[in-house]
A protein has these predicted regions:
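Small-molecule kinase domains that catalyze NTP-dependent phosphoryl transfer to phosphate-bearing small molecules
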Residues: 26, 192-248
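Active-site cores that bind ATP or allylic diphosphates and position pyrophosphate for catalysis
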Residues: 1-85
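Conserved beta-strand scaffold positions in the cores of enzyme catalytic domains, especially
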Residues: 17-19, 120, 186-188, 232-234
């Protein structure tokens, strides 16, 4: 397919192609041969580039010695670790009191038990350090989320798991973070908890203060929360425990 596509656009690209046919491995003769020259009764083996990625590298399987030298297979395994060793960003989003931080803590424990390097970036904690001095205007909220996203992207780039728990109410900003991290490494987890349940859990009295008008621009009361349209996971904390929800995330990963 790649050769056909390049041939089709070679004039436009100004790049010529030296075509080559597929080679397969003759198991009994222990040699390679161009596919059109292989006898019909011969036993052959072949692996495509897609199979190398999906069936071997992504699953941590060793490439067979007939396909490549062990030294090369080892280098490929280090350069393209299996999915369970790749970096990832688990981004919890939802209203205050929806269960983000609690589920994130349980998930962190599970991942550490599995031998993964996991780092929690809690929105409230980040505000007191990395984002100290920022307010709650839309601009400041976006800045806070992007700072968390930047740190998460660095963790992911070095093979770690960034577990981020932040209200992150705006779709556009969450998408910015997705692009920052890389769409294939970003797992958006929407904690789908009704507002009334979040208010019942209001241990800090923030919702009550917002209802009284003591706090302005509080998400869910007088500032909007934009629900994710297509999150990787949608979890309900009313019908499932934090342990069950964390297990669902591990299973997804």
């Amino acid at each position: 397919d790649a050769q056909e596509m390049l041939s089709r656009y070679s004039d436009e690209l100004g790049v010529g192609m030296v075509p080559f046919r597929e080679f397969v491995y003759l198991e009994e003769e222990k040699r390679y041969e161009e596919v059109s020259r292989v006898p019909k009764a011969a036993r052959v083996a072949s692996i495509s580039g897609t199979q190398v990625r999906e069936q071997y590298l992504n699953r941590g399987r060793t490439l067979p010695e007939w396909f490549t030298r062990p030294e090369v297979a080892e280098i490929l395994g280090e350069a393209y670790p299996p999915r369970h060793r790749q970096g990832a960003c688990i981004w919890f989003t939802g209203l205050s009191g929806s269960g983000k931080s609690t589920t994130a803590e349980v998930l962190t424990t599970l991942l550490l038990e599995c031998g993964r390097q996991a780092t929690v970036l809690d929105g409230d904690v980040v505000r007191t350090h990395l984002s100290k001095g920022l307010g709650f205007s839309k601009e400041d909220r976006d800045t806070n989320i992007r700072r968390i996203g930047f740190v998460a992207a660095e963790i992911v780039r070095h093979g770690g798991v960034a577990i981020c728990a932040a209200v992150s109410p705006y779709k556009a900003t969450r998408n910015d973070v997705r692009n920052m991290v890389g769409a294939d490494r970003f797992v958006e987890v929407f904690m789908d908890t009704p507002l009334e349940v979040c208010e019942q859990r209001d241990a800090k009295g923030m919702y009550a203060a917002a209802r009284r008008g003591d706090i302005k621009g509080f998400t869910g009361i007088d500032d909007p929360y934009e629900e994710p349209e297509n999150p990787e996971l949608r979890l309900e904390t009313v019908v499932a425990t934090p342990e069950e929800n964390a297990a669902s995330i591990v299973q997804y990963l």
